[in-house]
Amino acid sequence: MNLYFLFFISTILAAKPFNSFNKTSLIDEGVDNDDDIVSKRAVVIDYCDTRHPNNLCKKYFEIDSYWNDDTDCFTNIGCKVYGGFDIIGGKAPKIGTVCRLKKGKNKFGYCNSKGNCVERDFIESFGVSIKIKGISHRGDDEPACPLYENTWINYGKCNEPYHCGTNYGLFYANKRKLNYFPDNGQKCNSKYEIYGVCYLGRCHGTGNFSNGEVFSEFGTIFKDVEIVTLSDGKNSSKRGKHKNLHGSKVFDSNGIYDIDPKNWKIEDDDKDITVHENAGDPKSDSRRC
């Protein structure tokens, strides 16, 4: 009984109080041995991943999204209680998460529903749009590229009309040649628009080439990119249903799959509408950049 009491007290002392937790994104810097490029990898610790099958992962637990093996789609996004006790049980593939196709190679794909890391197929659409406007802080783990500035795009169609990509494979947009990746700093489109990509829960971008910026492995972290879901949740190619906050707007993915994205965009009177998910709803994902 005394031993149990001592263990209980030590556990309480080891735990950090929630209100003292610093909600920041940690950056781990390392050197890429292939081409001596300094890489940065974000570790999300500011929210819990409600997509995880462990429903005990609530606000009092912190997220550690750092993969030991980013080729393994069955690696958990760890949900840990303050004090470091790992309460995760079982493993599940993070469908749609960016993953490394082969160890030691800077070429990336996505995790499919079978847990395999595969190259992106442009027949599929994962139902996420991106808008370069507004402020939000949580992200999805999938690549995206904008078609027109300040408009919603379906990145399953982002190969039209641009061929956008990076030499690290975080942007796939050349349907005819999937292994096409520009060199560092190579222009991705004629308008020099900023591209955004969410990776490991934070939103990254390639930079604005008109200002002389260049590609980096995961890009520059952006906080002004919003994600909206376009999915019906019926299969791995479409993200799950989400309840949106009052006043927000969401699109039905089934209604846009066969529409050329250059033919649809936000109407003028809707440009300032903030579209996001209800992170407070346990049935809703909290994927926002």
Swiss-Prot record:
<keyword id="KW-0964">Secreted</keyword>
<dbReference type="InterPro" id="IPR016329">
    <property type="entry name" value="Neurotoxin_TxP-I"/>
</dbReference>
<protein>
    <recommendedName>
        <fullName>Toxin tox21A</fullName>
    </recommendedName>
</protein>
<keyword id="KW-1015">Disulfide bond</keyword>
<comment type="function">
    <text>Has contracting-paralyzing activity in insect larvae.</text>
</comment>
<dbReference type="GO" id="GO:0090729">
    <property type="term" value="F:toxin activity"/>
</dbReference>
<keyword id="KW-0732">Signal</keyword>
<feature type="propeptide">
    <location>
        <begin position="15"/>
        <end position="27"/>
    </location>
</feature>
<keyword id="KW-0800">Toxin</keyword>
<dbReference type="GO" id="GO:0005576">
    <property type="term" value="C:extracellular region"/>
</dbReference>
<keyword id="KW-0528">Neurotoxin</keyword>
<feature type="signal peptide">
    <location>
        <begin position="1"/>
        <end position="14"/>
    </location>
</feature>
<feature type="region of interest" description="Disordered">
    <location>
        <begin position="270"/>
        <end position="289"/>
    </location>
</feature>
